[in-house]
């Protein structure tokens, strides 16, 4: 039953369930009430200095008494970094058109203001360097001049970023798993959280766009409370195992998004424990063809494959194609219902459907884990080692696995079975004490699929695999397992190898009195532990009085696991905390162990919670639950917590930790400084073949026996920072991968180093990024760590301990240790010799004696020789007199533009011999000496990349025939006849061009590509260009292909597949797309050279026989330009981005937004003609995670130069090739582009879709069932299905509808290949018609027309992505889309209409096809978009109707120099 608004109003007035539509009444802000709000992410913003809180009024924000609570003081972070006010039902925003005071509350989907905010050191900052401030009259304003700090009221000084919004990915519904949009408007009310409103089944739901009635995109919300009540209606229960499963087959998420969605419901991604469970999953999907995410992953850098829910991994069914090589990026597992060996590995960033799994009872596992850490005094016979009720013996005799098994059995024992992390700790200690590196354990498998079992028949309840394990050997009947000493991890081995082995048998348990600990204390290893349950401040807890002798210090993961188990016995409340001895009370920026009355201890291990340590200067407490045992920084005096106490076992002294500092010099060209225990090496683009992803970079370092760089202490970060400054120009903004990451899903979202050193500093203190997928960090030379997507490609830095000799990979090309500095390399020869000898040596090494051309280079050289020199030596440089008393010159012939002579040392009096220059290692000053004197020296070699470009012989401009277009030194002819009968195939087109004295066009640059594309505006016919697939590296005119723009949909050299015709090899030729229905505008793809129906572009060189004129000089660029129904204004002035905004407004325009390829191409030609970069209206407020247009335009179109170009600043410009770059907003550029934004129109189609058994998505006046594209039916069955739903199979009537359909189908990724269409072949006039009798407009059908020659009985029409109409046997099973007219009732007539409460029928993905797989990657590899498609997640699946093109007569347009048509 639907609730009426009158019944809802009293609920809206409750503070515990704010809805934001009522004033609310004053209430005391009790700690309990605050905690209740904060659990929902709702907080009160308090001025740290003024102690008053922000209240939102109707038109102004003010500071008020925090204790006078009302809803207008309550705030919440929402989608897209918005700040939502509960009472005002609006979002905090900046209106740049009101610069005198832009700050206020606005509609949360307003396109006229900026609604993004971020935290920076307790400041609330927005775009254009605005931040939230307090004015003299206690009003809250935005300013760019001052800074004000804000905290969360009642949090003990915590900032408001502790409550950042976290995406909720929807379940079922019609949104394909897209995240909820908060707030969203439903029934004329803004909802900042999931709601049950409008539903009779009481399930939580949300909209995935800002207005539900407009878009009707929705889904169910992950409900954390469902973990407490078992399986609800969106879960399916296996009655035999009492396990619940949720099949999200219509969603398309990355692995981490799917993992998060399952976790939010108290579950986890699917784990498969045995063949029975796998068969259950397979049978559930037996009628489908689908590949789904499961919880299998290898994201822990220190371990192997694991299940994300912690389930032991002993059952495996890998596909033979799985690659276990370390450089492979596929680290997440999938399950395929359509192959016997169903498990595959995929790139975790791929988007797929997924299955969640939830145990109804996890208590049994928790009891076993807790009991494993309990101390039991145990007695064993001589020669055996006691540990917790069992006895163990390491046999130091190498045997095969089977021999070891029989040997243990002969001794009344068994090969060791390992049941917990506690037992791993014991085994690691045992092997270490016995100096054994590896041993057999009792795990093996002789089954297919592989199922590892213990030799003593005990259950496998724990696994601990090594990196890249378990690796399954093909064609091997039995697999055996060993454990290594360093971490106790397991490896799959050939059973015939020989190793040591450990036997295990039951021991005799002694009484508890013999534990060695006092009553109330628990023992682990050589220490006793106790919990003081009284809440105290850190100062009280650490005094040694309440917690004698000291708070706990934690040295490794085993001790942490024991303590987590210990605190589980006393935790009753969700927010219980326990003080530990870690602190930074002196605010050094580095956390250390400081137990009371004891020496400070170095930190060997950390176990932080997400976003920790948040700041320096705090004290550390361990969390009791959610998640248990994780560490968080708290205020040392204000925060109260229980205490964890630790003392040595009686009569046992605490071992003193001795930190050893190796003094071994760094090997080869690794670098360090005195006092550091490690050496570093920078791998930059000048020295390696390519930039790499984070995992590739880590594997690269591992090849040397190293890891990506970590910072064990502040001194290491300082050294790396100086190292980068010493090599690169600080203006380059280079970014280098380091080992900082949060990839491990079992690590609670906390950051860690890949070499496992502890995290002791707040590296991400100044920026908060929320729960996004940027799980790896880069380092910049200004001491900045920046989170990025791990799949981005960057340079990197490796680190290795001083006393470890680097390995030399087989692919490594050894070179003498040259040092890099700003595009040159230097070799320091420390031995002494004459100047002429070194000139020969340097020449032999293809270099020259050192030249110094700047103060920076001088400083670099001086710092190096000062460190290398003994007794203040001087070093030869490349200065020499050609004859005595001549001027000194550089020997390589470069001019002397910088000098640093010591006074009087350049040339002594009465000099009679030839002299050469040197540099002093003490002062850095230059002097001269006789060239025969022996000194050390330095060689310098230039890089291959030159500092200036070679200048080609200038070409001469000429003339073009009438009807041809001028472009640079070419004439171009665009030939697209209006009569379709005049359209050409490739051979005819080339013949036409040849008769005109030219050839089909060879596109040689981005600008030429843009010029042709902009001239195709208004056309829907694709055009031939001069490439064939038998030589796609050479143009028809013989020039090499130096520029290309291939469609991501096309596969070079592979002909299209048609189910009705087994094609022979046919020649393919290149087309340029001007129809965006199936290929992006301007992209190239191959087609049968003999196909007619296309236009073409010819080229020939301009005629230079007469007087050549450069029309760029004759016709200057006008300031106002018209193109494609848009008006542009060019601003020529030296200005910042902010000044560009204001200047455009002064002219009645806006800074330009660019939303499609046509206008991008037009502006590319304009900018290239102007010759300098211009500001455009794109900007970011969150360090490049999201970008907005300053005029409020919403578009997913981007044109970045490369992936790095979006990370260099907050404001964006376009260069002279049209490519986009970000830079600092205060930078000065020579111009900006303004435009008059197109008017936005309200929807002309207010109809709604009726509720039936399947979900519908509305477009214009029709509704579509996209959930059925994953169901496999014959044409007839699909037709009947739609008919029962009161609809028909899909028909497509225009380009806008076609574009909408393809946009929606992209959301299914590789899951959709073909769908049935409601079309038939009319034999009377040999045309294809829709079943309603209307003809198909074949000119609108993408890249290939249907061939009527192949229409035969029993063949039906399908839409194949991305090729267009295809023929298939009607009995084949394919997906389909039902279509019906929308309900004529409007949203106003249905105020209580909610989303359909029917649950989407389970559907699954069709067979993966190569063409569609490439289609799936299209937004990731789309030219200049790179990895930004996922970064622009706020624009996922947008639909923007195609422009209603009308032919534009470009010959009468602007840009005379290039666009004019000759009158000759």
From Swiss-Prot:
Q: Which residues form the Ricin B-type lectin domain?
A: 40-163
Cite the entry's keywords alphabetically.
Answer: Cell membrane, Disulfide bond, Endocytosis, Glycoprotein, Lectin, Membrane, Receptor, Repeat, Secreted, Signal, Transmembrane, Transmembrane helix
Pfam families per record: CysR_MRC2_N, fn2, Lectin_C
What SMART domains does the database record attribute to this sequence?
Answer: CLECT (SM00034), FN2 (SM00059), RICIN (SM00458)
Major localization class? membrane
Name the membrane topology term: Single-pass type I membrane protein
The record's subcellular location field reads: Cell membrane
On assembly, the entry states: Interacts with sPLA2-IB/PLA2G1B; this interaction mediates intracellular signaling as well as clearance of extracellular sPLA2-IB/PLA2G1B via endocytotic pathway. Interacts with sPLA2-X/PLA2G10; this interaction mediates sPLA2-X/PLA2G10 clearance and inactivation.
Q: What's the protein called, per UniProt? A: Secretory phospholipase A2 receptor
Organism of derivation: Pongo abelii (Sumatran orangutan)
